[in-house]
UniProtKB/Swiss-Prot annotation:
Pfam families given in the database record: Gp_dh_C (PF02800), Gp_dh_N (PF00044)
Binding site for substrate: 153-155, 199, 212-213, 235
Molecular functions (GO terms): erythrose-4-phosphate dehydrogenase activity; NAD binding; NADP binding
Subcellular location: Cytoplasm
EC id: 1.2.1.72
Protein name: D-erythrose-4-phosphate dehydrogenase
Subunit architecture: Homotetramer.
Catalyzed chemical reaction(s): D-erythrose 4-phosphate + NAD(+) + H2O = 4-phospho-D-erythronate + NADH + 2 H(+)
Predominant subcellular localization, coarse grouping: cytoplasm
Site (Activates thiol group during catalysis): 181
GO cellular component: cytoplasm
Organism classification: Bacteria, Pseudomonadati, Pseudomonadota, Gammaproteobacteria, Alteromonadales
């Protein structure tokens, strides 16, 4: 059993907690504490009721200092400075850093100084962390001495396994990506000020282009893909689930059947449980609460001139990513204890 704490109890922090209690990993991961500046009553309410993922399946209540889930008492903390958190006395193995604002080594080291053994960041980080992991692709890079690790992004976790499969079978020469991402809480409900002028506009009324560093994220996981990809991203008026339009030029000549067969075989083999495949006529809401990183929509695969391949990938950008946080944390512990 590993002892973990969640720092930042927003969309990803709450999804991590739910994922622990809804998965078979509950017997291996114990959530000991949550650090969040919000009031306990609000934390309780948003744990019990979730617009996207529904009601929590187990009774949740508060006492003076804890959130009680079944027989578990999770300590609630409200400390703005991570260096002051009681990780040492709580014997914390891993902190899930889910605030969205702590994303470099120096900031994360405050958790280590407070007594945590390791930190797993729930978003892309600066290059000075020990490793950036996309579970299923490069978790073997983890070493015992790694203390600060990034779990990359939901979109990187969605696309990199698929690129990896295509490259190993057909050799990827280049690619272009459009991420069609659900609205996020850095957007406005109605028009309001924001440093990004496009994000001053109402999230529910427009398709909104935003900056993305997805192409650079691919390079970090697959260094031989440096300068081979470019990406753009648009936010759309849905609250969850992301689609990725992936176009790649392959060295080998292929047809639709070959591409789909190779991808489907990967989902039944080394990427089982991480990447999925479907030929059903599904829409975005059908992938809500799907724990996989990526689902290939075989009905949308297209091939032009034998070398240009277009794919449509789906992912639950909250739930799939939260489940990968759990997988990566277990791999970190495995490497540390090896």
């Amino acid at each position: 059993m590993i002892r973990v704490a969640i720092n930042g109890y927003g969309r990803i922090g709450r999804s991590i907690l739910r994922a622990v209690y809804e998965s078979a990993k509950r017997d291996r991961i114990q959530i000991v504490a949550i650090n969040e500046l919000a009031k306990p009553e609000a934390m309780l309410h948003l744990t019990q009721y979730d617009t996207t993922h529904g009601r929590f399946h187990t009774q949740v209540k508060l006492d003076e200092q804890h959130m009680i889930i079944g027989d578990d008492a999770i300590k609630l903390l409200h400390e703005p400075n991570p260096a002051n958190l009681p990780w040492q006395e709580m014997d914390i193995d891993i902190v899930f850093e889910a605030t969205g604002v702590i994303n470099d080594r120096q900031a994360c080291e405050a958790h280590i100084e407070a007594g945590a053994r390791q930190v797993l960041i729930s978003h892309p980080s600066s290059s000075d962390v020990d490793a950036t992991i996309v579970y299923g692709v490069n978790q073997d890079l983890l070493k015992a001495e790694h203390t600060i690790v990034s779990n990359a992004s939901c979109t990187t976790n969605c696309i990199v396994p698929v690129i990896d499969v295509l490259d190993r079978h057909f050799q990827v020469k280049s690619g272009a990506i459009t991420t069609i991402h659900s609205a996020m809480n850095d957007q406005q409900v109605i028009d309001a000020y924001h440093d990004d002028l496009r994000r001053t506009r109402a999230a529910g009324q427009s398709i909104i282009p935003v900056d993305t560093k997805l192409a650079r994220g691919i390079e970090r996981i697959l260094p031989h893909m440096k300068d081979k990809f470019e990406a753009i991203s648009v936010r759309v008026p849905t609250i969850n689930v992301t689609a990725i339009d992936l176009s790649v030029t392959l060295d080998k000549r292929v047809d639709i059947e070959q591409v789909n067969r190779v991808l489907k075989q990967a989902t039944e083999g080394s990427f089982s449980g991480v990447v999925g495949y479907t030929n059903e006529p599904l829409v975005s809401c059908d992938f809500n609460h799907d724990p996989r990183s990526s689902i290939v929509d075989g009905t949308q695969t297209r091939v032009s001139d034998g070398h240009l391949v277009k794919l449509l990938l789906w992912c639950d950008n909250e739930w799939g990513f939260a489940n990968r946080m759990l997988d990566t944390s277990l791999e970190m512990i495995k490497a540390r204890r090896a």
